[in-house]
Amino acid sequence: MEPLVIKLGGVLLDNEEALERVFTALQEYRQTHERQLVVVHGGGYLVDELMEKLQLPIVKEQGLRVTPADQIGIITGALAGIANKTLLSWATKYQLASVGLYLGDGNVVTVSQLSEELGHVGKAMPGDAKLLKTLLDAGYMPIISSIGVTDKGELMNVNADQAATAIAQTLGADLVLLSDVSGILDGKGQKIPDINVEKAEQLIAHGIITDGMIVKVNAALDAARTLDRPVDIASWRHADQLTDLFNGVPVGTRILA
């Protein structure tokens, strides 16, 4: 079975109950299955809290955080520091052998600047799988922040969904986008079991899929096309379903290529 990339998002990093559910599921899964797991995370809520404390403006365009040069250090500290080490501490608590990384380690993901207007915001492309494969084969679960670096040595804030997609591409792995939403909802608030490009474009055009969810859906669609396999969007709230989810059973919205 191919490795599985699990992207953790939403309020999960700021919610002890959520972390407990996810790491309990990861521990149970690792005890009963041999599938290799990679965790990728952002930490938007942590960044927002830090920015507010420092009285710095929070600006987003189409779900992507505008990152001026004077803020990239703060965001790097929040994501590659606080968020990453928080998850590593939970992994230790649940006896999960883990290693904390950022996208530049071993050139796991190749990153370039997305645009001058967004500042230090990076575009993620597949990189070198050697380091990840070495860690996975040794029994470790890599926990990777969405901070990257360009070939000029400039730190970049990468959308975590897109970072997870690039890592799945690098490894030829399956991808699950795990957050506080159970999947994509239709206009009546009902979960959509599966969705393709055409259906997604219709929902975006009608304003049903908006803001950060557009980035999430586009990242999942891009991953599904690139990997030529389905990608799942699901919630951590349904802890009893997570083991099935990690085994490839759809429990949220399945994104079709």
UniProtKB/Swiss-Prot annotation:
Entry keywords, A to Z: Amino-acid biosynthesis, Arginine biosynthesis, ATP-binding, Cytoplasm, Kinase, Nucleotide-binding, Transferase
Location, primary (coarse class): cytoplasm
Residues given in the record as ATP binding sites: 180-185, 208-210
GO CC terms of this entry: cytoplasm
Enzyme class: transferase
Subcellular locations according to the entry: Cytoplasm
InterPro entries tied to this protein: AceGlu_kinase-like_sf (IPR036393), AcgluKinase_fam (IPR004662), ArgB (IPR037528), Asp/Glu/Uridylate_kinase (IPR001048), NAGK-NC (IPR041731)
EC number in record: 2.7.2.8
Residues binding substrate, per UniProt: 43-44, 65, 157
GO molecular function, one term: acetylglutamate kinase activity
Catalyzed reactions: N-acetyl-L-glutamate + ATP = N-acetyl-L-glutamyl 5-phosphate + ADP
Site for Transition state stabilizer, residues: 7, 216
GO biological process, one term: L-arginine biosynthetic process
Pathway this chain belongs to: Amino-acid biosynthesis; L-arginine biosynthesis; N(2)-acetyl-L-ornithine from L-glutamate: step 2/4
Source organism, top-level taxon: Bacteria
SUPFAM superfamilies assigned: Carbamate kinase-like
Protein family membership: Belongs to the acetylglutamate kinase family. ArgB subfamily.
PANTHER family: N-ACETYLGLUTAMATE SYNTHASE, N-ACETYLGLUTAMATE SYNTHASE, MITOCHONDRIAL
Assembly and interaction partners: Homodimer.
Its biological purpose: Catalyzes the ATP-dependent phosphorylation of N-acetyl-L-glutamate.
Name of the protein in question: Acetylglutamate kinase
Organism: Photorhabdus laumondii subsp. laumondii (strain DSM 15139 / CIP 105565 / TT01) (Photorhabdus luminescens subsp. laumondii)
Gene: argB
